[in-house]
Structures are given as C-alpha cells and as structure tokens.
Amino acid sequence: SRRRFLAISALTLGGLAFNALPRSARGAAPERTLIAYFTWSGNTRGIARLLHQKVGGDLVELEPVTPYSENYDTCLEQAKRDQEQAARPELKTRIADMGRYDTVFLGYPNWWASIPMPIASFLEQYDFSGKTIVPFVSHGGGRLGQSLTAIAKLCPSSRITEALSLRYSRGSSPSGDMGDR
C-alpha cells in the first residue's frame, strides 16, 4: 500500500536526507528556517516532513489556487503547457513574514527537467535576497534537470546550496544523491 511504502521510505530517507544535506544547512537555526514545498503525488511532501523532523523550522506546502489534474497524463500535459508559456499559477499559500527566514529548504518534483511553475510563482512572490536556498528534488530519473539554473535566475541574490536529489520509481524505495552545485 502507499502508506506502507511511505513509512518504509521514511525510515530509509531519515538518515539519508539529513546526512546528504550541506553542513551549513544542517546547522540552520530552526526559528529562522522555512521548509516550503510543492507536491503533486505526495513524494515531495514525504521528503519535506522528514527534513522538518531533522531540522525543525516552519513547514509549508505551496498550493496553487487551481490544482493540477489528478490524472497523471493530464497533469503532464498541463505542466508542459505551463512551462512553455512560463505560466505563474496563483498560489493560495501565503507566507506571513518571509523576512524572518534565513534558510529556505525548497522542495519540488522535477517537471520537464526544471521547476514546476508554482515554484516559480513562489520565488517571484517573495524577496529571497541574502537567503540560503536548499533545494530538494523528487524525480523519476531526471535528477535535477535544469532546476538549479531556473532557481538561480529567479533568485540571483541568494545563496543556493547543493541540492538533495531523490529518485522514486514505482514500488521501490527512494534513493538519493547530492546535486552538482
């Protein structure tokens, strides 16, 4: 079952996710840390919750006003169209005081070798100048794609650390590695 898979994955990922984080991210002050993520299938939510258990801080799911289709193929088409049009879906999620965070763990699935457009909306909606961004990515084999480049373009005055990249395949436990940054 999906719950059993996530429970087993959580045990596997717990140490992996924390140990794979850059040292600077491991020591982030919990009261100055935000874990923000977008998920479609729930995989990224699972990773975000594990990180939250390890580093503390505030945990926030970035939800678009208009959700993506629950049908996989329809979602893929919609995500591709959003990428091609550089869409910025409106988010119903609001961060009350973004200025209080120094470190932002940013989680998302790799969609079409980049960030999902709700992540672009989030990055454009707030000032990330001087903040440390720690990306964590769930994927089915595409690793980080061009997502770090996309984040760097949207947040040129931020420090972007190495990324945690976790692969999910149907019916298997996630496996992870560090990104190229």
Language model feature labels by segment:
Residues 22-27:
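Boundary at the C-terminal end of the N-terminal hydrophobic targeting segment
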